[in-house]
Amino acid sequence: YPLRRQRQMCIRDRNIYRGCSYSCVFCDARSTCHRMDHEFEDIEVKAHAVDMLEYALKKKRTRSMIQIGSSSEPYIPLEEELQLVRRCLNQIERFDFGLVLHTHSMLALRDIDILDKINRKTKCIVIVRLSTYDDSLAKKLEPGTSLPSERFSLMQQLTERGITVIVNLAPILPFINDDMENIQGLLSYCVKAGVYGILTDKMCPVLREGNRERFYQQLYKNFPDIYDQYEAVYADEKTLKTKNYTEIMACIRETCEAHGIQYDKAVSYTHLTLPTKRIV
């Protein structure tokens, strides 16, 4: 029920850009199921995104949450120049809608003034993805993206404004970032930043057509020492579930309960909604 309700009360996700200039070792957006008909690095810009959003919001008869960036990172380097995301945020604030923003980029701080306005009028939630607390490891896993220490700063500055932050803990890759030191480091960031919740439903990467081949290529390139381990343990497995998954989940649950952080997926996703309110 909570998930069904959440879908009903959110406008269809707005992905202003399709594709990405980053080169993360694992990237689900590269899967063929997302039906991208061009090279992933050849970024598709939805030039009329602002006008289309304005038109959609004018027609809506009930307030709801609008999601930006659940499939593609909205704050790619190109956004610094085009500012399409910022202009879309202005429309959301103008029409008094709520916002769910997915990002792992420090560029989001550029728009903290608008995020703050949206949050004061309705609700603003920022979902930040984290996979490691180690900056040096992140440079290999997610080259070009904002470092974990920078994302921690982003989370802190958002929560200081009263903006809700939820951490998407993903991906946790076997033999790479599934050690308990890394998990505890990630949880420490969450506790210190005062996040509302932690999502773990995408923690275990799923290899699909389109991203599987590239994942193993990147694995061999960046982590050649463990390539054979993957071949031996996972072979043709679709889901890369770490062997210490149970221990990781127990650690997350214990930490969240001790610090009042939500770890129940249904509770966090339900929080992404707004009470139904008809526009007069």
Question: How should these model regions be labeled?
Answer:
Residues 45, 107-109, 174-177, 206:
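Acidic-and-aromatic substrate-binding clefts and catalytic sites of carbohydrate-active enzymes
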Residues 1-7, 11, 271-280:
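Single conserved hydrophobic/aromatic residue that forms the stacking wall/gate
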Residues 5, 181-272:
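Auxiliary Fe-S-binding modules of radical SAM enzymes
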Residues 121-134, 198-203, 224:
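Non-cysteine beta-strand/loop elements that form the S-adenosyl-L-methionine
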Residues 41-45, 80, 142-150, 178-182, ...:
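Alpha-helix N-cap and loop-to-helix initiation/capping positions
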Residues 133-135, 142-144, 158-179, 203-205:
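Conserved strand-turn element in the central/C-terminal portion of the radical SAM core barrel
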Residues 5-8, 12-127, 135-139, 148, ...:
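Conserved Radical SAM active-site core
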Residues 91-97, 153-165, 193, 247-264:
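A structural motif corresponding to the C-terminal end of an alpha-helix
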